[in-house]
Amino acid sequence: MEEKKKQTEPEACKVAKKCGGCQYQGVPYKEQLKKKQKMVNALLSKYGKVEPIIGMENPYYYRNKVHAAFDRDRKGNIVSGTYETKTHRVVPVENCLIEDKKSQEIIRTIRGLLKSFKIKTYDEDTGYGLFRHVLIRRGFKSGEIMVVLVLGSPILPSSNNFVKALRKEHPEITTVVLNINDRKTSMILGEREKVLYGKGFIRDELCGCTFRISPKSFYQVNPVQTEILYQKAIEFAHLTGKESVIDAYCGIGTIGLIASGHAKEVVGVELNKDAVKDAILNAKENQIRNVRFFQGDAGEFMEAMAAEGNSMDVLFMDPPRAGSDEKLKMI
């Protein structure tokens, strides 16, 4: 039992108080679930029965998407990590307890390569420097890894040698993408991209479907829990194969494509054009023909459907953090 405890409950994160990303860090996982259950009950119990939370067997090192901001400390050493709560000061992070271990190894290697290749990190105050962020996405089932290098200009000095050196240390990397963000903004990714190695995207499997994931695509960061979440959503929808389903805020089409085998037809709507492109390609790659995807605002799209007299039987909705459109209250 003592050995099992060591495996499932690592030491408390050393930067948790500065980072602010894990507010319950140091609290035993079972206690975290109890606290969260109380919060959910308080919010939703007036609407119906609240089922018990389904927790993870091992709630560590699960994130398949890892971001690191780069800067220099007071001594001029290159550091990488996350922003301190409510600031843009970089908190150096060597080991995050919820981020994929391999991705963290790659970030540490990149930090060393910046020093070897004499590449300057970007300074947000002065706008001077080149290297801003690294974004890594890993397919937990496919094993494919995408590394996105975010720069303040479109040119990475000695880019071929840089990529070769990176892949020499981590041959598992299947694609490297250069993203250009030359604006003074808190956004991580810019609009322009250039593929330095590989196809510029990765694939992963979820609930039996294969998904193409680009640098800007939304894809759930916890693949283990996502499968449970989607399966439960489809179960609670009581689909019989006769229903017309709408997947609002569909992203790259994950929920809609997985639900398509249980429904008559599925319509997905998403504002992000890159995500819609991936969703259409995902439908083709999975040979799913009863799904259509549209680019647009989910609320406006469904409002227009209602005005035309079109109806759907089931709505799946996974909105962004800001929440769903106010128009949905009227539909």
Question: Locations of the language-model features?
Answer:
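SAM-dependent transferase fold signal centered on methyltransferase-like domains
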Residues: 1-195, 206, 235-242, 310-316, ...
